[in-house]
Swiss-Prot record:
Organism: Pyrococcus abyssi (strain GE5 / Orsay)
EC numbers: 2.7.4.6
Superkingdom per UniProt: Archaea
Transmembrane segments: none
Gene: ndk
One GO cellular component term: cytoplasm
Gene Ontology molecular function terms on file: ATP binding; metal ion binding; nucleoside diphosphate kinase activity
Protein name: Nucleoside diphosphate kinase
Principal location class: cytoplasm
Family annotation (InterPro entries): NDK-like_dom, NDK-like_dom_sf, Nucleoside_diP_kinase, Nucleoside_diP_kinase_AS
Length: 159
């Protein structure tokens, strides 16, 4: 549970969202929620990188299809920062299985009804440890930036 501290988390806008033109809509939701994008790029994930990212699923039956899916098209990877960012982003993303995602969440609003739950629009780190590990997989330190936003002023002034 977050104690209202500033955190960073990794978000991946997955192939099903990229090919449907949802990148801007998804980024906009995070920014409107007061989260700050401190790193972002479009990349084509290699098979090797995908296998590192999803290493904890290596022995699961869906591992191969997960790697094939995430390497199918370019994706957008982002480092998102904010108070309790990991928890907030996970709530905004919605249930991992799109069939269970509530309307108003990213997956609830944008995931298509397909038999494969891996086509779920976004990836969001599930813990502080995962976020730190995943951010290091995709970003060098000099690719993550700090800059002021209006929210910083509100928190500093105690409004």
């Amino acid at each position: 549970m977050c104690e209202n501290e500033k955190e960073r988390t990794l978000v991946i806008i997955k192939p099903d969202a990229v090919i449907r033109g949802l990148i801007g809509e998804i980024i906009s939701r995070f920014e409107k929620r007061g989260l700050k994008i401190v790193g972002m790029k479009m990349i084509w994930i290699s098979k090797e990188l995908a296998e590192k990212h999803y290493a904890e699923h290596r022995e699961k039956p869906f591992f191969k299809s997960l790697v094939e899916y995430i390497t199918r098209t370019p994706v957008v990877v982002m480092v998102v920062e904010g108070r309790c960012a990991i928890e907030v982003v996970r709530k905004m993303a919605g249930a991992t299985d799109p069939k269970n995602a509530e309307p108003g969440t990213i997956r609830g609003d944008f995931a298509l009804e397909v038999s494969d739950a891996i086509c779920n629009v976004v990836h969001a780190s599930d813990s502080k440890e995962s976020a730190e590990r995943e951010i290091k997989l995709y970003f060098r330190d000099d690719e993550i930036f700090d800059y002021p936003r209006a929210e910083d002023w509100f928190y500093r002034k105690g409004i």
